[in-house]
Amino acid sequence: DFPDLNWDDNKLTEEHTQMLYESYNPEHYQELLFSNSGYTGPNGENLISMRQYYQSESGDSYSVAGQAAGWYRASKPASFYGGNSPTTDNDLNAQELVREALNQLAQDPSINLADYDIEDRYDYDGDGNFREPDGVIDHLMVFHASVGEEAGGGVLGPDAIWSHRFNLGRTHVLEGTSSSLPDRFGGQYAAFDYTIQPIDAAAGVCAHEYGHDLGLPDEYDTQYTGKGEPVSYWSIMSSGSWAGQIGGTQPTAFSSWAKHFLQKSI
């Protein structure tokens, strides 16, 4: 979260989001992402978790597991990270927010980073084995303390961060950590890829951004040409990530193309 927008004083109202909770504590995200039995919605209903979504879509052949950590406080106001570039309209310093979160994560004694380094997604040693540690955190998901800019940004408006999947430009070493690979990053862990989601995220946006981290592209009109979207709500990688009476809580399936891609690649 931010010095001027705390996770437990986030200024959210019903005008900003349908996913309004009294508390967005780490336990909320643990259930949202990794529960086998769903998580509690804002009206007390049971909603599908990201884990359940991936299990259902894969016929129980793929699942996700992890740990929700934090919250960690950024060093600068929210607008420093989410303010838009005058030339590209992209968030100015979202990557810096991720780096700051990683630096604090590295000092968190409750986190065993070895649990999150089981893949060698870029085959750094060239041995053809992608199922081995490489010293890099496999799938990093960061949540920020505002509504996403794609949904209006809440009190931050255009200074909010737009949900996305990207990388840090270069590997970011987590100083003070210790990995099992002394020849990489000085024997410390590092991070490269990440996704970032809003405080009020439902499973739809989480599963969508995680889909990008697995290699899937967007299936909507990313150039906003106005020509329409043939896929639309038929895929979570398009408008389907917003499906549900409460937007994003009942994401639609992966498209047949996306399922074919995932079947071949993971």
Predicted regions: what they are:
Residues 37-181:
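Active-site-proximal segments of metallohydrolase catalytic domains
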Residues 19-23, 32-36, 104, 108, ...:
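Structured segments of extracytoplasmic/periplasmic soluble domains
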